[in-house]
Amino acid sequence: AAISLPLGYTTGKEYAELEWPIDILIALVWISYAIVFFGTIGTRKVKHIYVANWFFCAFILAVALLHIVNSAEMPVGFMKSYSAYAGVQDAMVQWWYGHNAVGFFLTAGFLGIMYYFVPKQAERPVYSYSLSIVHFWALIFTYMWAGPHHLHYTALPDWAQTLGMTFSIMLWMPSWGGMINGIMTLSGAWNKLRDDP
C-alpha cells in the first residue's frame, strides 16, 4: 500500500483502495490469523471462553467477511480491476464495508482489549457478565445494519436509508452498556488509573 497507492494503483473506493493482488494477500493474512485464533480457542483447557474473546472473535470474523465481500473484483490487469458490483449496490456494499470495517476493526477490537485488561488491572471480575452478553449481542446485531446512514439522500431506497439511520440511533444502547460495564468494573479501584501504568 505504501508503494502502490502513491504510484496511482487504486480501486478508487474509500477505505478499500488497494488493488486485487494486495486484497488477496490481506485476505490470506487475515484468514491465517483466524486459523491461529480459533485453533487456540479450540485447544483451550478451560471450558469457559472469556468475554474479551467474544469481541475478538467478532472482530476477526466481521473484518474477514467485510474485506472479502467488498473486495470482490474482476481483474483486467496486474494492478487494475473493476468492482463486482455497480451503481447503488456498489455504494451499499462499499458503505456496509466502510462503516463496519471501522466499527469492527476499532470498536470490537478495543472492547476486547477493555474486557481483558480492565478486570485484570482492577483485580476484580467484570461488573456484570449478563450486561456483557447483552452488550456483545446488541453491538453485533445493530452495528452491521448501520452502514446505510452514509448514503442518506442518495439513490439508495428510502427503506434502506431509514433502516441504517434507525440502527445507528440504536447503537447508543450497546455503547452505554460497554461503558457502564467498564466503569463499574473499575468502581472501587479508581486508584489503579493513577498508580498502575
Residue ranges and their predicted role:
Residues A1-S4, I26-V36, I60-N70, G112, ...:
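Helical transmembrane-bundle signal
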Residues E19-V29, W95-A108, T162-P174:
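Alpha-helical transmembrane segments of polytopic membrane proteins
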Residues P21-I24, Y129-W145, A155, W159-T162, ...:
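Catalytic-domain carbohydrate-binding cleft regions of carbohydrate-active enzymes
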Residues I22-L28, H48-A62:
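Membrane-interface loop-to-helix entry segments
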Residues P6-E17, V36-W54, A72-Q94, T107-V134, ...:
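Juxtamembrane membrane-water interface segments of multi-pass membrane proteins
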